[in-house]
Amino acid sequence: MSSAICPCGSGDLLLACCGHYHAGQPAPCAEKLMRSRYSAYVLGLTDYLVQTTLPVQQAALDREAIAQWSAQSTWLGLEVESAEVLGGKPEHAFVTFTARWHDGNGEHSHKERSSFVQNQGHWYFIDSTVPLKAGRNDGCPCGSEQKFKKCCSAYVI
């Protein structure tokens, strides 16, 4: 494992790249978090994928489905097209990427523009497949103590 190349496509060793984040060090930016999440799919690190999703969405994630998809796929690569840091308090970002994999149904390519939010020194993926149950004037689910309409509502794709 110490000489394994990181699956995220950086060309660095896993331990010097995404391995830090898998071991508990917070990712310094949304792009690094997204890359570490791709690596987690490759490595079957379901707990990491759940922990790096917005905390209010974690209970709704299907851990078994995540683990099965991870295990049943041969991961072919990741290409990051762009990372847009939008600033603000809390800080928000979009990362556009394409992930490729092969499974029992053939080869697949998925392009996505993912949303991220930083709270208390940690970046989190905002999962667009898990509804955020918040009205515009409710507190934001990211934990920022701002109203949803002033915080994450514009970043939920």
Curated annotation (Swiss-Prot):
Superkingdom: Bacteria
Signal peptide residue numbers: none
Alphabetized InterPro entries for the sequence: NTF2-like_dom_sf (IPR032710), SEC_C_motif (IPR004027), UPF0225 (IPR023006), YchJ-like_M (IPR048469)
Family: Belongs to the UPF0225 family.
Name assigned to this protein: UPF0225 protein PSPTO_4127
Lineage of the organism: Bacteria, Pseudomonadati, Pseudomonadota, Gammaproteobacteria, Pseudomonadales
